[in-house]
């Protein structure tokens, strides 16, 4: 399955929302802001989708307010968000960069990303200070590890600023905290101050459920329970059920950035070849949270499969 890190829209249970008489959309249903010119919109959620939709509505002439549910990591898309990829501009080949990036042990990678996040905060200081002034709640990931570790652990919780944050700082896009909303009413959101924030449209930019929910929907409870959680780090400090065998024979997962998929697709292919050659069991056994105990067997099988397949010209060796 190459369906991405996220799949099924996550719809929060907000009983009061049924009181609203306007239009309610999940971000996955949003298409264009033109229909909402001169209308009032509330966008609930402050991740990438929420910011992008708020900016699109604003550019289409809507009066927009962003509703922040929890603290969010904000980083300018240039240059700050690109800091983790600086190696790719320093001379090594693309293949070597991918290998270096994926071979760093997790504890060392965490320390590296803490330093990169501090560097990004310094680069984005003016923007971040401006967001704080208007009441935007910021965070920088667990232990300050930044956006990449948010992506690897939960697949969201950050925004690459391409202009929406600047509009919020300039108060061209409004900002309220979800905790300041007392109730949703027919006309919009009633604040705890007694004021009613009128709206014609409410967009739920509330994210997506993980791949395990899509597996349950497509293949049923037995397969989903057998496979377990997908993405996020397991006990073996690797992404769970990603680029490797799962407990369900024949079911494989690949997702992530080009940098991840370029190199891990080769390793995934080697494992499939090893299974086809009988060098590796078709399914992984044991806890879905960890594959540490089998890692040596997997590594040996990868090497053996590569040698055998390359010798018979039945598999393209990674370049």
Language-model regions: role of each:
Residues 73-109:
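A catalytic-pocket lid/entrance helix-loop region that shapes and gates access to the active site
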Residues 1-42, 46-48, 55, 59-70, ...:
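Flavin (primarily FAD) cofactor-binding/catalytic cores of flavoenzymes
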């Amino acid at each position: 399955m190459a369906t991405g890190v996220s799949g099924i829209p996550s719809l929060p249970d907000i009983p009061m929302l049924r009181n609203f008489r306007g239009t309610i959309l999940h971000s996955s249903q949003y298409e264009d802001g033109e229909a909402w010119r001169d209308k009032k919109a509330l966008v609930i959620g402050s991740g990438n989708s929420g910011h992008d939709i708020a900016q699109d509505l604003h550019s289409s002439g809507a009066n927009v307010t962003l509703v922040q549910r929890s603290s969010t990591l904000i980083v300018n898309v240039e240059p700050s968000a690109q800091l983790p990829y600086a190696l790719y501009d320093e001379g090594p080949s693309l293949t070597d960069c991918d290998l270096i990036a994926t071979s760093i042990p997790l504890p060392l990678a965490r320390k590296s990303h803490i330093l990169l996040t501090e560097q990004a905060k310094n680069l984005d200081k003016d923007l971040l200070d401006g967001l704080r002034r208007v009441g935007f709640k910021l965070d920088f990931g667990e232990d300050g590890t930044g956006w990449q570790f948010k992506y690897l652990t939960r697949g969201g919780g950050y925004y690459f600023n391409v202009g929406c944050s600047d509009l919020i700082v300039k108060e061209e896009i409004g900002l309220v905290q979800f905790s300041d909303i007392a109730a949703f009413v027919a006309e919009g959101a009633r604040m705890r101050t007694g004021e009613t924030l009128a709206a014609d449209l409410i967009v739920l930019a509330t994210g997506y459920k993980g791949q395990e929910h899509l597996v349950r929907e497509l293949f049923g409870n037995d397969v989903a329970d057998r496979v377990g959680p997908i993405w996020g780090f397991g006990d073996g400090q690797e992404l769970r059920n990603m680029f490797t065998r799962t407990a369900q024979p024949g079911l494989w997962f690949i997702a992530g950035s080009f940098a991840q998929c370029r190199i891990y697709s080769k390793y995934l292919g080697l494992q499939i070849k090893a299974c086809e050659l009988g060098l590796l069991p078709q399914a992984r056994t044991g806890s879905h949270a960890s594959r540490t105990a089998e890692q040596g067997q997997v590594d040996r099988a990868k090497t053996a499969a590569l040698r055998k397949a390359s010798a018979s010209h039945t598999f393209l060796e990674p370049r």
